[in-house]
């Protein structure tokens, strides 16, 4: 069985300074019961929400997420978001990004998109752990929405080697100091790269921070949000800053 490349993320306590939650949320006392509300609006969003930066992206920006209870926890919702592999060719091949939503437990304010960093850590797992990560006022007022960035997790993951091949590659000499060892090292690296290309296809060339940030704007539109309310940790702050540079008028 093949294994996607994994990068262990550090779940930092520092939150993104670039895109902040700027809304006050009324909390409840611990003794007050809470019920799961309908987490997202059912009416179509205004045209200003789904307006695409490029006319060729209009269909993708108008998509709505079909949420269903997650298999792992039916209290959470799972879905997918369709994005182009290459934004320079918006009518070309597409991939689906994995999404997970923890519905607001109280009076809903909106959606909060989160990313744990890495780069490459699964945002769906981060959102699923929301109760252990975020304070109660945030959980009451916001749907916590996580996504696996393109090329990671369940979002068209980059794939290279089988488990056995990866073990053999990692067991190689990382510091070659003879001509023979240098040649062996070079051959193994080239083979690794070639297998990544063969197994992953065109998505391998499109797993950049800029493309992940553009994916977040498609997600904002699909969530029916006029502006993106976002919280990132570690590398997630870079992703948030990149989004703010690309879409300054869409920052919440």
Question: Which positions does each model-derived feature cover?
Answer:
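C-terminal region of N-terminal signal peptides and the immediate post-cleavage residues
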Residues: 16-47
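Gly/Pro-rich cap/lid or specificity-loop segments adjacent to the active site
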Residues: 48-252
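Charged, compositionally biased non-catalytic regions
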Residues: 4, 12, 25, 41-56
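Secretory targeting and sorting signals
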Residues: 1-23, 81, 216
